[in-house]
């Protein structure tokens, strides 16, 4: 098949690579423009653009594809059979969606219609979902509303953070998209409704949650929340959930909620700590214990939270004994502003 590929972050690289390895002709790659990053504010190409250049593929980087009629015309001239979109970062206008005769297909990083929107991986963890997955969806004008052709499910473990989960889902997306292409090609061109009917796609239910873009406030830990809610925040926003310690920013990167009903999902070391501190009696964010080989036990609403790894502003990430020493923490001190 002649495929026009749309994608931007590292998440989208495996799908491009595997479609290319499967023998499909990638007629072009569309990605977000180079952005300034880092302390030196150097222009840096997206991960997908870098991969495309490594594969000697033509690259297009429109600032806004919806308003760039010249780019739209260039892409139409490539005569792609189908478009494949994975985390591109812009909404495609109808005139672009209607170009390829075999349709535009999106690799979506969640189970639909559970999470639609910009940050489904993060919100699936934040909301405590037991499972997530990926889907290959026929694109239409609505945001993530199209019918689903294929889907794969994946359990979310208590210690799965957003980065680790994204890596798993990225690989699944690539596998699923490679599986989908022969099905799409076999059905051939024709009116959209007829093509989708022959493919046997599953139309989505109306009920869904919107995985909105994350904002600065989402990353700030509130120690009046439960240990489980804070843990999900640390995992879902990895590595960015933060609090403060003696006026400096403290990013939490690994925690364990010391909750009896979750005991079988905790590490052996954390299991031994469950139930050692009575609930209540301490303000949220109070250091209850400094355990040299594990980290800090901190109070929250209900059961306490074990901080196993964190990064203090101006320091490298540390864990266990090194973390306790770096923070010079003592019992009854307070973390955060609560």
UniProtKB/Swiss-Prot annotation:
CDD domains tied to this protein: FMT_core_Met-tRNA-FMT_N, Met_tRNA_FMT_C
Catalysed reactions, semicolon-separated: L-methionyl-tRNA(fMet) + (6R)-10-formyltetrahydrofolate = N-formyl-L-methionyl-tRNA(fMet) + (6S)-5,6,7,8-tetrahydrofolate + H(+)
GO CC terms, sorted: cytosol
UniProtKB keywords: Protein biosynthesis, Transferase
Chain residues that bind (6S)-5,6,7,8-tetrahydrofolate: 110-113
Documented EC number(s): 2.1.2.9
Pfam families: Formyl_trans_C, Formyl_trans_N
InterPro entries recorded: Fmt (IPR005794), Formyl_trans_C (IPR005793), Formyl_transf_N (IPR002376), Formyl_transf_N_sf (IPR036477), Formyl_transferase-like_C_sf (IPR011034), Met-tRNA-FMT_C (IPR044135), Met-tRNA-FMT_N (IPR041711)
SUPFAM superfamilies assigned to the protein according to its UniProt record, in alphabetical order: FMT C-terminal domain-like, Formyltransferase
One example GO MF annotation: methionyl-tRNA formyltransferase activity
Protein family: Belongs to the Fmt family.
Role: Attaches a formyl group to the free amino group of methionyl-tRNA(fMet). The formyl group appears to play a dual role in the initiator identity of N-formylmethionyl-tRNA by promoting its recognition by IF2 and preventing the misappropriation of this tRNA by the elongation apparatus.
Name of the protein in its database record: Methionyl-tRNA formyltransferase
Species name: Parasynechococcus marenigrum (strain WH8102)
């Amino acid at each position: 098949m002649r495929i026009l590929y749309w994608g931007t972050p590292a998440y989208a690289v495996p799908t491009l690579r595997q479609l290319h390895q499967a023998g499909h002709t990638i007629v072009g790659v569309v990605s977000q423009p180079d952005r300034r990053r880092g302390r030196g504010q150097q222009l840096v190409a997206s991960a997908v653009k870098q991969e495309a250049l490594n594969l000697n593929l033509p690259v297009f980087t429109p600032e806004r594809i919806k308003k760039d009629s010249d780019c739209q015309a260039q892409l139409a001239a490539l005569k792609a059979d189908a478009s494949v979109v994975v985390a591109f970062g812009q909404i495609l206008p109808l005139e672009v969606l209607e170009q390829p005769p075999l349709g535009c297909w999106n690799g979506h990083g969640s189970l639909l219609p559970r999470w639609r929107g910009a940050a489904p991986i993060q919100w699936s963890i934040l909301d405590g979902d037991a499972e997530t997955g990926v889907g290959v969806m026929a694109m239409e004008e609505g945001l993530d509303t199209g019918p689903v052709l294929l889907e794969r499910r994946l359990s979310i473990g208590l210690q799965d953070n957003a980065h680790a989960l994204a890596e798993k889902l990225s690989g699944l997306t690539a596998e699923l998209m490679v599986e989908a292409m022969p099905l799409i090609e076999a059905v051939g061109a024709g009116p959209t409704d007829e093509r989708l009917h022959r493919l046997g796609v599953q139309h989505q239910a109306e009920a869904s949650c919107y995985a909105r873009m994350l904002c600065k406030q989402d990353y700030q830990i509130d120690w009046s929340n439960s240990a489980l809610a804070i843990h999900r925040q640390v995992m879902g926003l990895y590595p960015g959930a933060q609090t403060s310690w003696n006026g400096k920013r403290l990013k939490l990167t690994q925690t364990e909620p010391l909750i009896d009903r979750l005991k079988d999902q905790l590490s052996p070391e954390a299991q031994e700590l469950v139930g050692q501190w009575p609930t209540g009696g301490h303000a949220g964010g109070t250091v209850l214990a400094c355990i040299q080989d594990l980290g800090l036990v901190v109070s929250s609403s209900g059961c306490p939270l074990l901080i196993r790894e964190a990064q203090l502003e101006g320091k490298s990430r540390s864990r266990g004994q090194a973390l306790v020493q770096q923070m010079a923490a003592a019992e009854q001190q307070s973390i955060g502003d609560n």
